Amino acid sequence: MSDILNTILARKADEVAERSARVPLAELIARSADLPLTRGFAAAMQASIAAGDPAVIAEVKKASPSKGVIRPDFHPADIAVSYEFGGATCLSVLTDVDFFQGSDAYLRQARDACTLPVLRKDFTVDPYQVYEARVLGADCILLIVSALEDAQLADLSGLAMQLGLDVLVEVHDVDELERAVQVPVPLIGINNRNLRTFEVTLQTTLDMRAAVPRDRVLVTESGIVTQADVQLMRSNDVNAFLVGETFMRAAEPGESLRQLFFAHD
């Protein structure tokens, strides 16, 4: 596990304690019991792929620990509308405050502005956060295998599905993938960024894709920058993508998405 991830996870444990002191778990559980149905994140991804289209999870991200502020002019609702118009299948919204300058409010703003299913992009380590995601309005949560023990992975994914949430399980290497496929969730993300060096190589996805069961949706994450990158993935039967920084640095994120995935010569 990388030093930055260790730092983030230590902070998350404190954050959960702080939040549960303000809003007790029992209250969150009660509030989660009578909510509208989620929008169907995994189903939307599967439908795009079945139609022969790339399934794009477009990320709403202001900053990152490695890059600092990526998008100073940051308006989540406008970005969400732009992404939907540009052809995104789903959204990913960063809610981590301390390391990514995210916010729960950003998720609500983005989701309220469009009809797309939304992933809460955060470091989920405790059942409290799963209930919290459901109450916030998320349709899917992220579980990072390198941050969790097998029992946590099983418990958190099981709770999420019980609450009607989809789960994207993220891996970085073959050992993590072997653990991930034991969890009965339809979405497996392969992060092309090495957590120790922060280097990005698309070869990570290509090397691991054959080990992903055919009944799962393989989502390639990080490093998709050019149409050639997209074509490389699609020619290797990788049809689901999570892209953030490339779009966030563009004046019009949705137009950047359209050009990258849907503009053909």
From Swiss-Prot:
Its GO biological process terms? L-tryptophan biosynthetic process
Q: What Enzyme Commission number does this protein have?
A: 4.1.1.48
Q: Enumerate the CDD domains for this protein.
A: IGPS
What NCBIfam families does this protein's entry cite?
PRK00278.1-2 (NF001370), PRK00278.1-6 (NF001373), PRK00278.2-4 (NF001377)
Entries under SUPFAM superfamilies matching the protein: Ribulose-phoshate binding barrel
> Keyword annotations for this protein?
Amino-acid biosynthesis, Aromatic amino acid biosynthesis, Decarboxylase, Lyase, Tryptophan biosynthesis
The record's annotation in Pfam families points to: IGPS
Per the record, the pathway is: Amino-acid biosynthesis; L-tryptophan biosynthesis; L-tryptophan from chorismate: step 4/5
Q: Which family does it belong to?
A: Belongs to the TrpC family.
Record organism = Xanthomonas oryzae pv. oryzae (strain PXO99A)
Task: Spell out the molecular function terms from Gene Ontology.
Answer: indole-3-glycerol-phosphate synthase activity; phosphoribosylanthranilate isomerase activity
Reactions listed under catalytic activity? 1-(2-carboxyphenylamino)-1-deoxy-D-ribulose 5-phosphate + H(+) = (1S,2R)-1-C-(indol-3-yl)glycerol 3-phosphate + CO2 + H2O
- The gene for this chain is trpC
Q: What is this protein called?
A: Indole-3-glycerol phosphate synthase
